Amino acid sequence: MAVFMNRINMRYISIIAAFAAAALSCFASVASASEGQAVAAAPASSPVVAKILKANASVKNIESKFTQLKTIKASGRKIASEGTLYFTPDGHLTMRYSKPAGELLVVNGNKFHMNKGGKAMTFDTSKNALMGSLANTLVNCIKGDPETVAAANNAKLAASETAEGYVVTLTAAAAGHRGYSKIVLTYRKSDCVLVKMVMEETVGITNTYEMKEVKKNTSLPSDAFRIPTK
């Protein structure tokens, strides 16, 4: 896919940027070159990425608290949000906001639901390739498979071990006018679970998501991935 998220309507991008998606947003989401320009493919799997993927292979589900800090470079304004995240690696993700209350992001099968500012939208990802790509990006980042995200979007990938954790950076080879120029994922060393995601937009907005009180292989609420009916 020659264009990495920069063709998504900015109204939807701003909703995902409120994620968390996120999270992380977790919710997903690196800008790429303009359409028609070549973008370097991701390199072969690094030892760090291989370790992250292997460690997450035994994860059946995740529940965590998350915080989001949106920083607008031009004004210096900062907007804080928070909520609860539910995830299973087979393609289910919910980011349920407590602040602002009522905001919601759900990926469930081929459905992608968002509620932002009281406006609800549900997409069929089997018919909407862009939203399908975005859903896959979010899911694969959380499940510890950033290489699949990089390969699917022709983004550059770099991985390293730092004092903070295992850090994977996805970077657009040439930033478009819209979308994300970079995503930085931090997986904690103890079990390679995603604990931080920084998403940098080409327009000067940065969203930082942090996962706290992470529980793995736990009992999730029966309605964790339910999409609200109209």
Task: Give the location of each predicted region.
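Flexible, processing/modification-adjacent segments and terminal tails
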Residues: P43, V48, L53-K65, K70-I72, ...
